[in-house]
C-alpha cells in the first residue's frame, strides 16, 4: 500500500502530465475561439469569392 510519503508510480505521473497538456491545449483552443481576440478572427470561406 502506498502512503503519501512514497514515490508515485511512474505511469501515474506520465498519465497526469499528458492529461494536463491536453487540458491546457483544449483551454487555449477555447480561449482563442471565444476569447477577447475572437472578434478579429475571419472566416476564409466567407472571404473567398467564386
UniProtKB/Swiss-Prot annotation:
Protein localization: Cellular thylakoid membrane
Task: Note whether Cell inner membrane occurs among the keywords.
Answer: no
Domain of life per record: Bacteria
**Pfam families according to UniProt:** PsbN
Q: Which sequence ranges are marked TM in the entry?
A: 14-34
Q: What is its main location?
A: membrane
Give the UniProt keywords, A-Z: Membrane, Thylakoid, Transmembrane, Transmembrane helix
Topologically, how does it sit relative to the membrane? Answer: Single-pass membrane protein
One GO cellular component assignment for this chain's record is:
plasma membrane-derived thylakoid membrane
- UniProt-listed GO biological process terms: photosynthesis
Instruction: Write down the InterPro entries for this protein, in alphabetical order.
Output: PSII_PsbN (IPR003398)
> What does this protein's UniProt record list under function?
May play a role in photosystem I and II biogenesis.
The family classification in the record reads: Belongs to the PsbN family.
Q: What is this protein called?
A: Protein PsbN
Q: Species name for this entry? A: Prochlorococcus marinus (strain MIT 9312)
Amino acid at each position: 500500500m502506498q502512503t503519501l510519503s512514497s514515490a508515485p508510480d511512474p505511469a501515474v505521473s506520465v498519465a497526469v502530465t499528458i492529461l494536463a497538456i491536453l487540458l491546457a491545449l483544449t483551454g487555449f483552443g477555447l480561449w482563442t475561439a471565444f476569447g477577447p481576440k475572437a472578434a478579429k478572427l475571419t472566416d476564409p470561406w466567407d472571404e473567398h469569392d467564386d
